[in-house]
């Protein structure tokens, strides 16, 4: 949802949080500007399985049920609609593969007042097509609707990510102010059931009665104001962002065995990955090479940024060892960044 520019500074670290700085060399890169007038609140991002350097996005609540694919220069490649979906408060997207098929997920999980007893995930096969230079691909897509609730009551959420094989979805609640009930935002895991075919069928059909799924709290996250999350294609990196920065978790094998994400959240410290300063930066997504991030903002004609997660400035070592400053009782942190233009 739209917020005042000043509110991006009301962020979100806990003074007790410890963050390891990411390796330092390199800079942010601007790729282009989203050209579509229809994309005014890019709230989520999902990597395309079929087209390199292309991503799917969608608008926040109040903008219908369209999903858009754009290229690295900001050009619109596809403009599709989910014909059997509703946009109560869409906040995130993800992509995954399952049973030899390529899927996209749209998460209707926004709940600013934390009153929703059930939320929805819309899952559909990514359409495969040959892009055209002067005309965007358009099709009505049918999605499978999954309904879920949180085990400990309604939660506001803007960050959702799916593991590459589509077995689990992770969600993080968005909290600005500390409360007596929960100091840190919860990280939740939702196990996905087998997907019911057919998806993207041309005929209209009635949704079967859905079994209510339950998202279980598996860990806490030491930073507030979370707006986006993504898992790398190889399943070894997970990034969580807020309006000013991002935090990178990595699965490192021990005795030849990778830990679960629950173990990583519990036992490891995230590395800091600063974000470009945006009016309302929310969406984030890994690229195919597992080493870069694409980030957008909830404003019209926003800049598309590319971030190298393995290349940040050495000065962060000192920045993240300092105590965060506080404004109006809300702790905040900001890191100046060097940027470069893509050639």
Residue ranges and their predicted role:
Residues 12-14:
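N-terminal signal peptide c-region/cleavage motif recognized by signal peptidases
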Residues 18-343:
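Sequence/structural signature of beta-propeller domains
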